[in-house]
């Protein structure tokens, strides 16, 4: 018919059905066909609007053009209503209730043996080196994306072996022969796992696979009721490989994204199970994608007084980086919080549980991660080492940035600890214990209180030997007690009376039980001999004053 013919509802309906069918086919082939109205809202509106307008134009029908325009207008209105312009409180509440607590009340004290000294970049190199030890295997596969996780209380980077090409996938139809584990605390602990319980591993469901074993397609075919993101390769406590895939829905009307659970797929067999957040297996470390949490934190901080807060009153924003930290075997996202307009000054930091998304705010003024990195690099500027992004730790109730210092080849050369509250309080060493000892000395010499720690110990005894050491202008007395192999280091900043101590004096020492070193940093020192002398001198002075008063 000329110019499309006469418009009819039946003909229009055919256009609509064909357009939706075409859209469904396209989305299906892209593994994005989701049976959820809120997530698929845009995919519903676009075909309807375009089809209505095109049909109206080709059939000279204003009502269909108007209908298409009205649907676009409806979409715009709904998006505005769901945007922060109107629903700023709903956007700010995406993060949930943010609890404010003291740093020392929840963060576990440092355990040097569990402190991650290997970052992802170095772990990648170690994994590639391990794979390269088997030339025949290295030509068939490559190491996938490494993810940090806790396995039976120990931190490892884990990644599957991926097919290196389509041809390799065809020839290795049973799957790749295992996965790689790289310890985050010991660079000598790198494992290529090809067997489990005496049985060979065959990882079939991978991002590098094709057709029905392609990971994205496999997830889509097993769950079309929610959108998927954050495909994470994780091991259960027995070392069995799985894919943990975040399921999400819309968070505010038809906008934003909110994690609702996970689809867990056996990487070998393809068997799957859908879990809500509340009934997730304990071995799963992460459900909440880091970009979701970053977005929530920024909305929570910037929308404190709505969108039209042009004076930036009380506005907060997260710092550039985000890191994973483990506390009591729970996984958290860490990020610093700054005031808008003050990029280098920290007002606190947040820890967000990577499973349930619960966030805790720790208010403390201090330095940002970037400022701490520059401070650590400044200590060894002659070597031009670069600092890795900091890992937040608790050293004697003091929030502390820990980082490694690497050379131009990416090799770890030093370790650094920087106090969050004062980034000038920094220590650098060539071993973890040496760095910790230096850091504790610096804390003591800067009069930062280290009392009240749950790892504090007390010892009493008689001095056997005492010696003086000058470190960076500070007087440090090393004391050995009888029948005690430890060496107790006492700064004159901690106790002036230590300079009067001598062998044979009875002393009481409080110290931090941190690490395995024989040399121990003391945070409280009492000498019974000098203290008793001080008391006698005080009594004599009081008696003299009283006599003078009587005379008057």
Regions found by a protein language model. Name each.
Residues 3-552:
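Soluble extracytoplasmic regions of secretory-pathway and membrane proteins
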């Amino acid at each position: 018919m000329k110019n499309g013919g006469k418009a009819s509802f039946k003909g229009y309906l055919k256009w609509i059905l064909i357009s939706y069918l075409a859209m469904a086919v396209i989305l299906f082939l892209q593994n994005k066909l989701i049976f959820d109205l809120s997530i698929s809202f845009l995919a519903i509106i676009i075909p309807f609007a375009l089809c209505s307008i095109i049909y109206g134009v080709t059939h000279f029908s204003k009502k269909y053009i108007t209908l298409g325009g009205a649907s676009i207008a409806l979409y715009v209105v709904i998006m505005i209503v769901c945007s922060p312009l109107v629903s700023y409180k709903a956007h700010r509440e995406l993060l949930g209730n943010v609890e404010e607590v003291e740093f020392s009340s929840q963060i576990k004290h440092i355990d040097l043996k569990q402190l991650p000294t290997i970052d992802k970049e170095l772990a990648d190199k170690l994994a590639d080196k391990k794979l390269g030890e088997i030339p025949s295997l290295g030509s068939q596969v490559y190491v996938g994306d490494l993810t940090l996780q806790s396995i039976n209380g120990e931190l490892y980077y884990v990644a599957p072996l991926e097919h290196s090409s389509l041809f390799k996938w065809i020839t290795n139809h049973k799957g790749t022969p295992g996965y790689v584990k790289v310890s985050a605390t010991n660079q000598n602990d790198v494992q290529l796992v090809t067997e489990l319980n005496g049985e060979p591993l065959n990882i079939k469901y991978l991002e590098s696979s094709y057709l029905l074993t392609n990971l994205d397609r496999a997830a889509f075919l097993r769950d079309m009721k929610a959108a998927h993101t954050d495909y994470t390769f994780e091991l259960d406590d027995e070392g069995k490989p799985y894919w943990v895939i975040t399921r999400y829905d819309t968070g505010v009307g038809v906008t934003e994204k909110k994690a609702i659970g996970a689809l867990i797929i056996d990487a070998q067999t393809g068997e799957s199970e859908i879990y809500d957040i509340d009934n997730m297996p304990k071995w799963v470390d992460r459900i909440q994608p880091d970009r979701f949490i970053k977005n929530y934190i920024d909305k929570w901080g910037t929308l404190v007084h709505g969108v039209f807060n042009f004076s930036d009153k009380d506005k907060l924003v997260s710092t550039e980086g985000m890191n994973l930290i483990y506390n009591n075997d729970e996984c958290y996202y860490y990020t610093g919080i700054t005031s808008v307009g003050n990029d280098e000054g920290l007002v606190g930091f947040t820890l967000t549980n990577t499973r349930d998304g619960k966030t805790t705010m720790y208010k403390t003024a201090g330095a940002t991660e970037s400022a701490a990195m520059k401070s650590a690099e400044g200590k060894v500027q002659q070597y031009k080492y670069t600092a890795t992004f900091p890992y937040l730790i608790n050293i004697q109730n003091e929030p502390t940035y820990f980082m490694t210092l690497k050379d131009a080849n990416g090799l770890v050369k030093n370790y650094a600890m920087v106090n969050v509250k004062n980034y000038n309080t920094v220590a650098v060493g060539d071993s973890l214990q040496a760095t910790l000892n230096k850091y504790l000395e610096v804390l003591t010499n800067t009069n930062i209180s280290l009392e009240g720690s749950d790892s504090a110990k007390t010892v009493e005894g008689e001095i056997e030997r005492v010696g003086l050491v000058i470190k960076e202008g500070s007087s440090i007395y090393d004391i050995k007690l009888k029948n005690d192999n430890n060496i107790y280091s006492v700064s004159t900043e901690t106790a002036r009376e230590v300079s009067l101590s001598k062998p044979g004096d009875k002393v009481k020492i409080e110290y931090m039980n941190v690490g395995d070193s024989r040399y121990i940093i003391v945070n409280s020192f009492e000498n019974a001999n000098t203290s008793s002398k001080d008391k006698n001198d005080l009594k004599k002075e009081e008696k003299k004053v009283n006599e003078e008063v009587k005379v008057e």
